[in-house]
Amino acid sequence: MATDDSSGLECVDQGGHRGPGGDDPFAVWCEMREREGARVTLIQLYALVAKPRGLEPHELPLAERRELAARATPLMWPGFEYNERSKPRERQPVEVVAYDQGWPERFEAWRGRLVGLLGPVALRIEHVGSTSVPGLAAKPVVDIQVSVANLGDEDRYVPPCEAAGLQFRLRDDEHRYFQPPPGKPRHVHVHVCQQGAEWERVHLLFRDYLRCSAGAREAYAAAKREATRLWGNDRPAYTEAKTDVILGILDQAGAWAAATGWGIRG
């Protein structure tokens, strides 16, 4: 979920040097992102590269889009880095399916496993993402958010998550991400975050608002359908294509939270 404002962003080339704007699409995109924050997405970078060639963003060759995404990701997600011990999974097209009544059961099974392995290190274990919202179409992957007291103390939670059969794939300033290793079904993702941080709050608020707002659910479902149509073979772009709708829903959710007294339970 792209919600950072990326303040203080530096526009750098692949050699690590700050570049001017001018006609360089990447530098222009960086300046746009620095001014306007997360509403300037990877799709705009694709557009800046594609337009002079008479192409639509989704018409850029996939290999070129992947290079652009790899260059932009550290700027969109400060602190981003892959765990050098992890192995990349084979790239698969985005698949969005109808809501499955079995997703909550899958979450509960994984929750029990994580509780047993993490013990008191896990201050909160929550089902988040689209599979946590009854009736909402989703990628068939259960997202689990684990809140801890100290995100930087990886030795306390990385080994237990790995013992659950997950690999520690990447980190950024806000969370740590675990997924099944290559060769295993991709049916669960675990996101470890700092208790009380914005990452924790935003994902729980987004979930709870979608659960109670049919209009927000339909808007999000429509965004998913369109993103899949255009970007089904490009996972970073699929995620980024939903940004405007997500930020709009979060604005509504913020007003709803203020009106209802919503807060993180417990």
Segments from the language model and where they lie:
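Hydrophobic helix segments
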Residues: 20-23
